[in-house]
């Protein structure tokens, strides 16, 4: 089994006219490399009618409903994260409840608020209530602010994780750019923070450093927007790990932190 813990899809209310082909191409590429399940989110309108990193409540509702529709259309291949904006706290909690009722298995937070902000506490409590992991967009060692987003770094995510030790948090895209050593140092001794290996970065020594920092038990495989570099990292991990260790990264760790029966038995 191979679980992509960080995937994305599009809808008709996003800037891409080729959104259907993009969605189909992800599934085709996943078949080629052996992905069993794509655990995915849709980030509002991807900037069409509200900012990607500050999506409106209406855009999130539509995106999450379309994510559930994809789940229903591909029940053996797709699972959904509920995407929420913590600035709309009560709405976010309601969306999580709707998502759980519709079979979604995690929470997706992007860059609408720093991860150590108290506004995220009700979301973390809702995740704990429903046994959902939280995938949080992270800029590896933020050096400056970017327009239209409040990007978080690993230190800020760990502050949230310390406040909610019963919630499993996923540090998104270690290979997404920036100082991943800073991130690994921050998460080393925070056992409820897992690291997803997605992102286009494939720096020499990154995977070895990740294994040294958090061990194979807290690594999750993922791709983010494209599959090619995720596949490259998986092939390299196969040269570093035993078969059982590789299976942990491929699917066993994900199966342990997502809700029971979220994935087919293996």
Question: Would you name each region that the model predicts?
Answer:
Residues 54-142:
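Active-site gating/metal-coordination segments in enzymes
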Residues 14-19, 46-58, 143-151:
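Short, flexible/disordered intra-domain loops and linkers
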């Amino acid at each position: 089994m191979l679980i992509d813990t960080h995937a994305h899809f599009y809808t008709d209310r996003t800037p891409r006219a080729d959104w259907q082909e993009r969605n189909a191409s992800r599934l085709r590429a996943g078949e080629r490399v052996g992905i069993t399940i794509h655990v995915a989110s849709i980030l509002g309108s991807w900037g069409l009618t509200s900012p990607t990193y500050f999506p409106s409540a209406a855009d999130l509702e539509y995106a999450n409903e379309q994510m559930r529709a994809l789940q229903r259309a591909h029940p053996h291949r797709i699972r959904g994260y509920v995407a929420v904006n913590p600035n709309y706290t009560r709405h976010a909690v309601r969306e999580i409840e709707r998502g759980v009722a519709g079979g979604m298995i995690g929470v997706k937070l992007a860059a609408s608020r720093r991860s150590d902000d108290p506004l995220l506490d009700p979301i973390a409590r809702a995740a704990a209530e429903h046994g959902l992991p939280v995938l949080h967009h992270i800029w590896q060692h933020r050096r400056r602010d970017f327009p239209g987003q409040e990007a978080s770094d690993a230190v800020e995510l760990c502050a949230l994780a310390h406040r909610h030790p019963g919630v499993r948090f996923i540090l998104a895209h270690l290979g997404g750019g920036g100082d991943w050593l800073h991130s690994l140092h921050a998460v080393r001794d925070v056992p409820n923070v897992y690291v997803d290996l997605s992102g286009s970065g494939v720096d020499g020594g990154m995977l070895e450093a990740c294994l040294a920092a958090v061990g194979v038990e807290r690594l999750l495989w993922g791709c983010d927007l494209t599959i090619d570099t995720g596949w490259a990292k998986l092939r390299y991990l196969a040269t570093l790990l035993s078969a059982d260790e590789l299976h942990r990264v491929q699917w066993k760790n994900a199966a342990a932190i997502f809700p029971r029966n979220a994935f087919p038995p293996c």
